Amino acid sequence: MATASTSSIPAIERCAGDPAAFVRDHWAKAPLLRRGAGPDGFDDLLSLDDVDRILSTTSPRTPAFRLVKDGKPLPPSAYTRSGRMGSVPLSDLADPGRIFELFHDGATIVLQSLQRSWAPLTAFARELELFLTHPVQVNAYLTPPAARGLGVHHDTHDVFVLQVHGRKLWQVWDAAVPFPLGHQTKLPPGAEAPTGPPLVEAELAPGDCLYVPRG
């Protein structure tokens, strides 16, 4: 059973360092890259063993998880199975064998809204919500080596990227859509391919944190 994080450091400090400096200089304004934000990593929040346990033993159902490859979603029928809960038939249960087979073939595993079901992340998200006075959703992305999970895109929400395991190259450009609203999910014409050098180009290592404002 998952237990709350053992870290005594406040969640916002683990992500962004000094809270006042973060709000003054970065919140909704500019990216922030912190090397070694978690000196001991972030394994207390979610480890690779935890991901394996979630997929293999808890029988999650879509849309609590999904798979994408080269920026495109894979059909749920490719990685789900049928089952029963008592007398109720189910058709959207995780099929661990298919999931890990697709993962080794280059697909990214996405676990969604983990703050609802994984105790360490429930507590972590609640701390961030109290500081930011804003709802927090926690997703986990597990991408195999030499693969690309998502293509160039913009988000309608601010993002904290916590690198838990492995290394990943990130490129962040200036906002394509300044302060986008929730319905503004599509890039404007001509913004699909960013021009000019990125504001941030960095390979994240375990314990690093990258904050990206929406847009």
Regions found by a protein language model. Give the residues of each.
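Non-catalytic, conserved peripheral segments adjacent to functional cores
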Residues: 28-30
